């Protein structure tokens, strides 16, 4: 019996830039999914997860099944298929898992699960031959093809590596980054407003679809291939172009936030983080589905009232529901947490600790 762990992730900068092969700043955090696993003699994977019904999936047929979109066993089959395509080995295993990540709660439970499954296959059948970067790509492929969600690579890469990482996906650049918030006198927090990303795949998928449509106007497949000056010279009214404008501004902001961390410049980082949050709200518009759950919008409004002039706040991850990320002086966090939990319930607001941050 072997033990495994896959962390959740927090997106620090680069909101909806990864699916356009843009730039991202993300990090693994100190909560995730733990499991014990052992080989089986057959080609079945059986997973028992605390709080969920156990499931068994056969590895004999790894073709894409649209009926399994959104189901965890689809991710198992997808990761297994990618390992085989890469020349690896697969086989059955039994796993007992316990997750500290709420499904749809904003710390990328699906990516953590993909990385966990990849690590189990890697250890039990491949002697650890696959790198974290390869496992991240296997997870992304599983999510795109088998799970039916058009995610970029940010979630999986952050979950697969330890600590903070800067990604320039167009350039193929992956760099470790120090994110010493505590040493900068800051506390990073996440407030779960109670909404869930589950069931919001269509709203999420509309964002990359809009961005791809703008890119094609300029003869490109992704916005990272489009000259920002060319776009702004020919910008058209409408949501798709607003989302493209967000991409170009956010993509330029990511290395600036990386550099602010390197200098431990708290004031500049907070300024840029607030600019990221405003861009998501005003241009990307991934806060609320029309007529849908408004808890994320209310959470951002609360954070604004509490932290204006003191800290920074932004939508976390895919948006439309889920979590508010906030950064503030350490001395301000107790009062902030008390106020947010008064609105969203006990335990809804927690400090996020980045693994390997210092």
Indicate residue ranges for each PLM-predicted region:
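His/acidic/aromatic-lined binding-pocket segments of jelly-roll/cupin-type domains
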Residues: 25-27, 157, 324
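FabD-like malonyl-/acyl-CoA
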Residues: 111-112, 323-328
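Structural signature of FAD isoalloxazine-binding scaffolds in flavoprotein oxidoreductases
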Residues: 22-41, 161
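C-terminal nucleotide
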Residues: 1-9, 13, 34-71, 166-314, ...
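Gly/Ser-rich oxyanion-binding loop with an adjacent helix/lid
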Residues: 1-10, 14-23, 68-182, 307, ...
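Glycine-rich phosphate-binding loop
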Residues: 320
């Amino acid at each position: 019996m072997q033990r495994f762990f896959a962390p959740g992730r927090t997106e620090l900068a680069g909101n909806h830039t990864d699916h356009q092969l843009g730039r991202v700043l993300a990090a693994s955090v100190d909560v995730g999914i733990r499991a014990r696993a052992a080989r089986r003699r057959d080609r079945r994977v059986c997973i028992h997860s605390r709080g969920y019904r156990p499931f068994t999936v056969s590895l004999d047929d790894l073709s894409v099944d649209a009926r399994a979109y959104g189901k965890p066993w689809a991710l198992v089959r997808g990761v297994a298929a990618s390992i085989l395509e890469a020349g690896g080995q697969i086989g059955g295993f039994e796993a007992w898992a316990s997750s500290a990540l709420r499904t749809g709660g904003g710390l990328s439970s699906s990516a953590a699960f993909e990385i966990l499954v990849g690590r189990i296959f890697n250890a039990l059948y491949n002697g650890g031959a696959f790198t974290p970067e390869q496992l991240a790509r296997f997870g992304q492929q599983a999510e795109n093809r088998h799970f039916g969600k058009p995610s970029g690579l940010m979630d999986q890469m952050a979950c697969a590596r330890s600590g903070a990482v800067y990604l320039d996906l167009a350039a193929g650049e992956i760099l470790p980054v120090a994110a010493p918030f505590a040493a900068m006198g800051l506390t990073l927090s996440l407030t779960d407003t109670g909404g869930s990303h589950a069931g919001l795949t269509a709203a999420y998928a509309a964002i990359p679809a809009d961005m791809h449509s703008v890119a094609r106007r300029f003869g490109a497949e992704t916005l990272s291939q489009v000259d920002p000056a060319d776009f702004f010279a020919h910008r058209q009214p409408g949501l798709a172009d607003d989302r493209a404008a967000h991409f170009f501004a956010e993509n330029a902001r990511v290395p600036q936030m990386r550099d602010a961390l390197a200098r431990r410049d708290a004031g500049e980082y907070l300024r840029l983080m607030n600019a990221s949050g405003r861009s998501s709200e005003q241009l990307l518009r991934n806060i609320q589905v029309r007529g849908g759950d408004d808890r994320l919008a209310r959470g951002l409004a609360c954070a604004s009232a509490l932290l204006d002039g003191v800290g920074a706040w932004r939508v976390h991850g895919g948006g439309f529901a889920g979590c508010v990320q906030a950064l503030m002086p350490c001395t301000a966090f107790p009062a902030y947490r008390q106020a947010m939990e008064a609105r969203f319930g006990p335990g809804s607001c927690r400090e996020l600790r980045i693994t390997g941050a210092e």
